């Protein structure tokens, strides 16, 4: 299995958030993680990427047990996270941000070549490569966040609400970017409140409820959509 989570418990102090989460994620898929506000979606992604420590349970990525490893070692293995909100370094230029994405590697020429490739793949970044990144628009910043994550050479990308705060037009662009990355072989776990966007690009849907995965289905399975709507609309 590509990513395998078994009976995962995560607390904040005495507050129990994840209470026995188990899920299997296949390589090459876009997996959509749904759940009400506060259900623990961000907590789960942060636990996979090593930013949170679980109380018990295990997380396996290919042949490696991730829990217990430092977050930078998890990143080196190829599991990268895009956090909620846009995490770029606002006072640095586009290129400087991309260089940071390659921080764990040393070969300067190879890094420069990859930055060139990234600027071709996302022409808007190429055009604004020398701009301070705080001057980029919301959608451009989101593109930079994705490019930055790709610089880490991720195999699995964990994305927490990439469409947050974007206009409908830019939301479509983010969706296209995500499907494009997936076609190139990147596996993606997506947390997305925009149900229409999430369901339109996901292969598999997981619903987090009461600290567990309460539902898991193919996104083509309509009962998954109904279940998700029930959670979101409370109906
Ligand atoms: N660092 C923290 N310390 C204490 N409690 C936390 C911390 N982070 C999150 N929580 C709590 O844990 C619960 C789960 O939070 P989490 O951010 O994982 O939810 P979420 O599903 O991502 O919600 P949203 O959809 O609003 O982003 C919430 O009740 C939240 O208040
Ligand atoms: Mg969240």
Positions of predicted regions on the chain:
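Helix-to-loop junction immediately C-terminal to a conserved catalytic motif
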Residues: 49
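Conserved ABC transporter NBD signature motif
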Residues: 57-65, 77, 111-115, 217
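Catalytic Walker B motif of ABC-type/P-loop ATPase nucleotide-binding domains
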Residues: 157-161
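The feature captures the beta-strand-to-loop junction immediately N-terminal to the Walker
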Residues: 34-36
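ABC-type ATPase nucleotide-binding domains, specifically the catalytic core motifs of the NBD
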Residues: 13, 69, 94-113, 121-123, ...
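Conserved ABC ATPase signature
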Residues: 132-136
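ABC ATPase C-loop
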Residues: 149-150
């Amino acid at each position: 299995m590509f990513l395998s989570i078994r009976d995962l418990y995560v607390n904040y102090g005495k507050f129990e958030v994840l209470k026995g989460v188990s899920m299997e994620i296949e390589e090459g898929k876009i997996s959509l993680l749904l759940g009400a506000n506060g259900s623990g979606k961000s907590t789960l992604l942060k636990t996979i990427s090593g930013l949170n420590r679980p109380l018990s349970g295990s997380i396996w990525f290919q042949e490696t047990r991730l829990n217990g490893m430092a977050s930078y070692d998890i990143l080196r293995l190829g599991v990268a996270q895009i956090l909620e909100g846009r995490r770029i370094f606002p006072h640095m230029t586009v290129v400087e941000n991309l260089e940071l994405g390659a921080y764990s590697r040393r070969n300067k020429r190879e890094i420069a070549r990859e930055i060139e490739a990234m600027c071709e793949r996302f022409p808007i970044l190429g055009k604004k490569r020398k701009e301070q990144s705080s001057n980029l628009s919301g959608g451009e910043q989101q593109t930079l966040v994705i490019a930055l994550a790709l610089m880490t050479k991720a195999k699995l990308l964990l994305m927490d609400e990439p469409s947050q705060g974007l206009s409908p037009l830019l939301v479509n662009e983010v969706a296209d970017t995500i499907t494009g990355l997936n076609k190139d072989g990147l596996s993606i776990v997506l947390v997305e409140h925009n149900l229409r966007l999430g369901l339109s690009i996901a292969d598999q849907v997981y619903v987090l409820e009461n600290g567990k995965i309460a539902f898991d289905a193919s996104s083509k399975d309509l009962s998954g959509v109904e279940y998700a709507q029930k959670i979101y609309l409370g109906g």
